[in-house]
Amino acid sequence: MTTNNSMQGLVNLASPKMGTKILAFSDDFFGEVTRMLNDKDPIFIEDKYDNHGKWMDGWESKRRRDGGNDWAILKLGSAGIISKIEIDTSYFTGNFPPFFSLEGIYSETEPNKDSNWKSLIAKTNLVGDCKNNFELNLKEKFNFVRLQIFPDGGVARIRLFGEVKYNWDRFNNEEIIELSSLKLGGSILAYNNAHYGDVSALLSEGRGKTMGDGWETRRRREPGNDWIIIKLAQKGNIEKIEIDTAHFKGNYPDRASIQAISIDKNITTKDLIESSENWDVILDETKLTADNIHEYEINSNSKAEATHIRLNIYPDGGVSRLRIFGKKLDDK
């Protein structure tokens, strides 16, 4: 059993899957700045060069000869409270920045030279070829983040783990909403196995681009079945479910079922997992097919009020996307 990479259901707010983009930057001569948002871990290709020099899997600026420092501004796809920060300098050994700082702001418009940025991490040492991790204890939400490196160099990845804070007043109580959406605040709390693919893609927008763009378990050689637990972005009444096996052909699950629960009190992830086998069944065990979108209407007689759901697949395999649709209940 795994609890979402020890992040307790937090999402990477800097992920392109969230809609995060680079708004502006000072320089990316050696390595395109967008590379540092890549969800995949950085790689090193020894003999790969381009017109600017050694190809590096990350953002890398040229050597500064004029003083000052380099920077990049991220526009987060969803505003959120940042709890954990990872500045990954993997494979940057003689060319990593010795210091960095991080600032944030919440603004309905793009920041400018007069914007009042809040310091998240003051100027701090970085270690080369390393995942540099930091924790924050802030309650403010941000939708723009500025990474500054001193004076120049390369950053393989930036990851900002936190909780989406969406303005649910934008929806009325009769609208059908994708309650599981990553961008709205849906998150993966735990799963028993995720050997292949990208588990966070399960709640992402659009259809999977490849077989690697989804949740896939290893081949099960023992009795039982695989499962994953998801916290919905908002408590709601579930009315429709979509299970998409795009690109999974010889390795899609034979069957699937879904259970749900509505929890109003604080509960540990461990207790949640232990109780999940006894949650209400809202989708009985049903056959799946390869490379296909499966849609299910939830019977109004079912107990479909939920804050969390558990997807069971039998016995194993891959699911590209899971979408839970319904009407919101309590506003956050």
Q: PLM features: what roles do these ranges have?
A:
Residues 1-71, 91-227, 236-237, 247-332:
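Trp- and acidic/polar-enriched beta-sheet ligand-binding modules for extracellular glycan
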Residues 83-84, 155:
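Short, well-ordered alpha-helical microsegments
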